[in-house]
């Protein structure tokens, strides 16, 4: 059996499994409201990866703890975090540390992000002879794709093939001599090549590498509808994190909606775990309408097609309803769950569920690259980092790969990681011998093949564009500051034609998520009103700290 750790939530005992997150433990016991906003509304886990800050709780008297990132490793006393509550006072007789007093490390190559791309970059550079240090915010390496199971016991489903592949990659990196530091948040990037980071125990450190590989991944892009801020509404990735790391279901009844293959994978996994999957609501039409693209996928990666068909088969044989050409148009509380209104093709349906998972693609986590001055272009949906074929950005010594640069999936990220790692090592003066040259050639071919797969995949999942003009005024645009679309539209109508001006007038983007969710929406509103396409200067300027950090840590008082 799993090791049970007693925790208290609002004075009530909650049995938790050792190693799982606080969010997983609370969710497993039907507790979905974690934070209380300034309007006395509840918020719960939304992103599941430390980005949204909606799951903030007080742990052992310390506020500002992200429930999804806080591990149950001992008995804990947890309370909801309430807006405006008094903060604990901490004093120190020592003066704040100056920048020169902070510990400095000068690795030859610094890799930020321990997902598939970052690990492959680190392995390749290390094999070429470079000294490599990898920093990652998560408690264990692997990233969002290879996140490992964090709990153990006879009652826990064992790791699957995807888990095992990730564990093997981490073992390969360590065997090669790569230094991996987990639980480290890189919250500052300064030109030309300086980084500030804080560990989970509060030590703040400066890193001055000769070169850097940025592989910070992406976070999910939901679509705003009335009620998307309610507890019980979360991203597809959040629900998948609950299952893949903690073997916890987000609820007994789960609806999954949006666009893309991750929703299908989640449905198959949760159904296999015992959930009642109410429906998979897909904005695109049936895959059967794109036989040519499906054939192109099979030619590019037969194994991934077989995997996708297996997910479809598990949903089909499990009786999971698949609703194509439909989208969520609103969510409202009903009893202990949610009532979700679906529209599409002139039809409307209302289904009840405990949890609604939303997944409409991804947004790159590119703040470090932007702060370093790397060039970005806007592809109509998101910023894309300019890179050459080896991952070199417009800034010398800065390499980037994976979903933080645009979107390409884990297989493309891994192949691009090998290319970037070898290029970085070569740029540092290390020789690339015949064996590594063959690896480089193979990685380039693999990257191209999987890009063809991705192109065909998104042809299959091509869906009608969601219109920002159709989002009702009473819908929340800024989840943190509780600003609605109507206020944003009014500010733009008053002549405020840039994101910074709207931010100052309405507080959109001033919350703890730092505009990660509202910025793309605001850019779309401004573009719609002005007729000007977004570019790399359209959003909010990236400013440190990019991650939550205490004033005590900033002062160097660990």
Predicted regions and their residues:
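Short, solvent-exposed loop/edge segments of extracellular or virion-exposed proteins
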Residues: 8-10
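Residues forming the flavin
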Residues: 2-5, 18-40, 50-51, 56, ...
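Short, conserved loop-to-beta-strand elements that form functional interface hotspots
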Residues: 45
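N-terminal intrinsically disordered, low-complexity segments enriched in P/E/S/T
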Residues: 13-15
């Amino acid at each position: 059996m799993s090791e049970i750790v007693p925790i208290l939530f609002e004075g009530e005992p909650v049995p938790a499994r050792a190693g799982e997150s606080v969010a997983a433990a609370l969710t497993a016991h039907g507790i979905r409201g974690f934070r209380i906003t300034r309007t006395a509304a509840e918020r719960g886990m939304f992103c599941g990866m430390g980005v949204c800050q909606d799951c903030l709780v007080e742990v052992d008297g310390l506020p500002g703890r992200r429930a999804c990132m806080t591990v149950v490793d001992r008995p804990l006393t947890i309370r909801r975090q309430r807006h405006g509550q008094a903060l604990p006072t901490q004093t120190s007789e020592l003066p704040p540390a100056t920048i020169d007093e902070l510990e400095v490390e000068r690795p030859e190559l610094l890799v930020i992000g321990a997902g598939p791309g970052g690990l492959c970059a680190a392995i390749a550079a290390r094999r070429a002879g470079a000294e490599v240090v990898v920093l990652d915010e998560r408690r264990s390496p692997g990233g969002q794709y290879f996140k490992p199971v964090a709990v153990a016991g006879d009652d826990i489903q064992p790791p699957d093939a995807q888990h095992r592949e990730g564990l093997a990659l981490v073992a390969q990196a360590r065997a090669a001599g790569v230094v991996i530091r987990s639980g480290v948040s890189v919250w500052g990037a300064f030109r030309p090549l300086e980084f500030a980071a804080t560990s989970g125990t509060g030590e703040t450190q400066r890193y001055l590498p000769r070169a850097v590989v940025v592989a910070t991944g992406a976070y999910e892009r939901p679509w705003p509808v009335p009620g998307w801020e309610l507890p019980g509404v979360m991203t597809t990735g959040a629900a998948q994190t609950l299952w893949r790391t903690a073997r916890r279901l987000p609820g007994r009844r789960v609806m999954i909606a949006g666009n893309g293959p991750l929703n299908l994978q989640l449905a198959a996994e949760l159904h296999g775990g015992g959930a009642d999957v109410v429906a998979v609501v897909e904005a695109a039409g049936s895959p059967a309408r794109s036989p040519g693209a499906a054939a192109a996928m099979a030619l590019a990666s037969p194994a991934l097609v077989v995997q996708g068909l297996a997910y479809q088969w598990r949903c089909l044989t499990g009786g999971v309803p698949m609703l194509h050409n439909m989208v969520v148009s609103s969510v409202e509380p009903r009893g202990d769950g949610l009532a979700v209104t679906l529209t599409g093709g002139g039809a409307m349906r209302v289904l009840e569920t405990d949890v609604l998972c939303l997944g409409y693609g991804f947004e790159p986590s590119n703040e470090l690259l932007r702060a370093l001055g790397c060039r970005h272009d806007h592809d109509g949906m998101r910023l894309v980092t300019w890179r050459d074929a080896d991952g070199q950005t417009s800034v010398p010594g800065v390499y980037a790969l994976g979903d933080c640069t645009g979107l390409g999936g884990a297989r493309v990220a891994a192949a691009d990681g090998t290319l970037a790692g070898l290029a970085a090592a070569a740029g540092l003066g290390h020789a690339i011998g015949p064996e590594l040259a063959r690896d480089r050639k193979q990685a380039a071919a693999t990257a191209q093949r999987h890009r063809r797969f991705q192109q065909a995949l998104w042809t299959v999942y091509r869906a009608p564009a969601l219109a920002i003009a159709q989002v009702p005024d009473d819908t929340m645009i800024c989840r943190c500051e509780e600003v609605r679309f109507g206020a944003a539209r009014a500010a733009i109508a008053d002549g405020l034609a840039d994101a910074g001006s709207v931010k100052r007038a309405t507080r959109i983007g001033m919350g703890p998520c730092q505009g990660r969710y509202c910025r793309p929406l605001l850019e779309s509103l401004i573009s719609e009103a002005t007729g000007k396409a977004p570019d790399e200067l359209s959003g909010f300027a990236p400013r440190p700290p990019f991650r939550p950090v205490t004033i005590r840590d900033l002062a160097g008082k660990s």
